[in-house]
Amino acid sequence: MERKQEAQVTNECDFLITNSKFMLENFIKDTPKWKEHSTAIPNGYDEEDFKGLINQRNGQDKFVITHTGTLYGKRNLTEFLEGLKIAIEGNHVNREDIEIRLVGNVHESVAAEYAEKYNLQGKIKTTGYMNHRDSIQMLYNSDILLLIIGKVKGAENFYSGKIFEYIRADRPVLAIVPEGGAAAEV
């Protein structure tokens, strides 16, 4: 159904703009006419969103890992938490020294299930929905930012727009993304 809608839209447009070269290359492969009538313009961030915010890490004794946005279906914490479990069991990370913040629409019951499964009770905090500015402040209040692109067909062709806000926040980014794809290239 999505492919049909996509074809309807692209058949009617005069010029095609995508936000990644990977996506553009796929359009050109499917419809060669786009080679001469298309371009890729990457997403970015709005500098105004960062003005007046305090660029300061959490100031706690915890190492704060933050994910902003929605987790659902194949975009989930499983790979990250499996890796963290290995690091904790190998004594590379002290469970007591970390806090995982899920900023956005992540149901508390989902976070509780992860906490129980990975023995991280009290370590996974949810904030619920936050306005955009407060969400960006949470980036500044973090030690590392978690970016997850789910394992779905075509995931290598796109990235989340938040990647540019993550980079602008000047924190390390732990990216669980398709190798060689658009998000990995950024």
Where are the model-predicted features located?
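Nucleotide-activated donor-binding/catalytic signature segment of Leloir-type glycosyltransferases, i.e.
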Residues: 92-104, 109-134
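A short, active-site helix/loop in glycosyltransferases that binds the activated sugar's phosphate group
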Residues: 7-37, 184
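Nucleotide-sugar donor phosphate/pyrophosphate-binding loop at the beta->alpha transition
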Residues: 1-8, 47
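Carbohydrate-associated surface elements
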Residues: 22, 41-44
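Acidic anion/phosphate-binding donor-loop and adjacent secondary structure
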Residues: 28-29, 44-61
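Short acidic alpha-helix that forms the nucleotide-activated donor recognition element
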Residues: 8-11, 113, 131-142, 168
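Conserved donor-binding/catalytic core segment of Leloir-type glycosyltransferases
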Residues: 57-75, 81-82
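Nucleotide-sugar-dependent
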Residues: 75, 131-137, 145-164, 174-185
